[in-house]
């Protein structure tokens, strides 16, 4: 039984070792994105340069805009903007007033080519330099929302697991880390030795993380209160207790249980107040459940037809019943709904390659599109406003990294890389909102 339980925790590691030749199946169109140039009225002071650099990075980490900065220009008035040389669609003009030591007022103006008026303007007062990155992300959210009509995600967080000495018999260190969406401001919120931490998932209010762990001789599902660090065990069933996911209203969790010493797991929904269970599946290995945004259905992975694939079940069915998502998909794992409920992002293993990539399934037309082209990409998690997907990429040397890709597959960037094989990065989970 212990071997079965251990197998659940090394699932991500096993799939990361699929290194056969890859035939890329990326189908993305090239769309010209509006160019935003970020300029400042102060090119000498370090603080404005730092803020503007973060804004530019933010505005390049999405599917709708591209950005650059022009440090060589010191522009104090909109009339002085060199539109011809900039070739920009928009300019974000930032004006910095040093009120006192380490304290600034920052005015932000958005201008459009061939328009003499400000599109939008906002002022941030009494900003301490220690809040540099927070200010920059706030400005980025403001600019992104004004230019695209969509809410920005630049103040969101990522939770993920870092494992040191993963192959040692003893002394394996598991750390649950929360960082800014771009990997900065990392904080270890939970640390355990030789007791795995797996599949963290946020509550919708951002106050809790649920996760599974092997502790005290058995598996269980736990909650971690982020503000206090308080850990509470919420399941204690025999056998496998894994893959918890909170419902949108926070009143229930979906999870995988074996309910005894069996190699089969089924999906259940647990009422967190009463601890009552409702069974959703029967037969096979069923795991990795995720609620739809409206809380009315669940997607999960099952091998009931001989190979892993994605299935959908209603949470309101009187009896356990579910259906395969699509016959177009050969093998699939770890499904996640996009926030609008229109797409499902998952780990894809096509019939043409033994490698795994992150793919997008369009629920309206049934199309499947790979958005990454790595040899072992896994564990996708979607940003709360749907523009980006974070995931784990493992190279042919076995080194893992936490990466990000836009939902259209166009923009890729790295968040954190394990620089040797003695560290693994696993199980990213995107926060449900900005902080």
UniProtKB/Swiss-Prot annotation:
One Pfam assignment: PD40
Keywords for the protein's UniProt record, in alphabetical order: Cell cycle, Cell division, Periplasm, Signal
Gene Ontology biological-process annotations: cell division; protein import
Annotated signal sequence range: 1-20
Subcellular location(s) of the protein: Periplasm
UniProt GO cellular component terms: periplasmic space
Source species, domain of life: Bacteria
Bilayer-spanning residue ranges: none
Main localization, broad class: periplasm
InterPro entries given in the database record: 6-blade_b-propeller_TolB-like, PD40, Tol-Pal_TolB
Annotated PANTHER family: PROTEIN TOLB (PTHR36842:SF1), PROTEIN TOLB HOMOLOG (PTHR36842)
Summary of subunit composition and partner proteins: The Tol-Pal system is composed of five core proteins: the inner membrane proteins TolA, TolQ and TolR, the periplasmic protein TolB and the outer membrane protein Pal. They form a network linking the inner and outer membranes and the peptidoglycan layer.
Biological role stated in the UniProt entry: Part of the Tol-Pal system, which plays a role in outer membrane invagination during cell division and is important for maintaining outer membrane integrity.
Similarity remark: Belongs to the TolB family.
Protein name from the UniProt record: Tol-Pal system protein TolB
Annotated organism of origin: Francisella tularensis subsp. tularensis (strain WY96-3418)
Gene transcribed to yield this protein: tolB
């Amino acid at each position: 039984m212990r071997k079965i339980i251990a197998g659940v925790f090394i699932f991500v590691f096993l799939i990361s070792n699929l290194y056969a030749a890859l035939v890329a199946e990326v189908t993305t169109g090239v769309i010209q994105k509006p160019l935003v140039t970020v300029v400042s009225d102060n090119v000498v002071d370090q603080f404005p340069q730092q803020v503007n650099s973060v804004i530019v990075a933010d505005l390049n980490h999405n599917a709708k805009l591209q950005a650059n900065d022009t440090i060589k220009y010191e522009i104090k008035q909109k009339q002085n903007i060199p539109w011809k040389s900039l070739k920009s669609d928009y300019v974000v003009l930032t004006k910095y007033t040093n009120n006192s030591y380490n304290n600034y007022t920052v005015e932000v103006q958005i201008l459009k080519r061939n328009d003499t008026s400000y599109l939008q303007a906002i002022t941030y007062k009494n900003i301490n330099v220690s809040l540099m990155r927070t200010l920059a992300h706030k400005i980025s959210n403001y600019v992104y929302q004004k230019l695209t009509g969509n809410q920005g995600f630049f103040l969101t967080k990522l939770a993920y697991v870092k494992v040191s000495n993963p192959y040692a018999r003893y002394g394996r260190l598991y750390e649950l880390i929360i960082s800014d969406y771009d990997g900065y401001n990392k904080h270890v919120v939970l640390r355990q030795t030789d007791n795995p931490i797996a599949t963290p998932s946020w509550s919708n209010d951002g106050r809790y993380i649920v996760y599974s762990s092997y502790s005290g001789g058995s598996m269980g599902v736990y909650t971690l209160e982020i503000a206090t660090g308080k850990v509470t065990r919420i399941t204690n069933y025999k056998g496998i207790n894994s893959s918890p996911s909170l419902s949108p209203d926070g009143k229930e969790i979906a999870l995988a249980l074996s309910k005894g010493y069996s190699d089969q797991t089924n999906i259940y929904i647990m009422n967190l107040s009463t601890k009552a269970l409702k069974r959703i599946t029967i037969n096979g290995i069923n795991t990795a459940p995720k609620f739809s945004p409206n809380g009315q259905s669940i997607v999960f992975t099952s091998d009931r037809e001989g190979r892993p694939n994605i299935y959908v079940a209603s949470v309101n069915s009187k009896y356990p019943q579910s259906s395969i998502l699509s016959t177009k998909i050969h093998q699939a794992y770890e499904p996640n709904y996009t926030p609008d409920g229109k797409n499902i992002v998952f780990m894809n293993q096509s019939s043409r390659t033994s490698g795994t990539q992150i793919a997008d399934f369009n629920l309206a037309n049934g199309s499947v599109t790979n958005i990454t082209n790595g040899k072992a990409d896994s564990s996708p998690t979607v940003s709360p406003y749907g523009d980006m997907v974070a995931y784990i990429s493992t190279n042919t040397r076995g080194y893992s990294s936490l990466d990000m890709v836009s939902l259209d597959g166009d923009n890729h960037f790295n968040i954190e890389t394990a620089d040797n094989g003695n560290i693994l990065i696993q199980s990213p989970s995107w926060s449900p909102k900005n902080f």
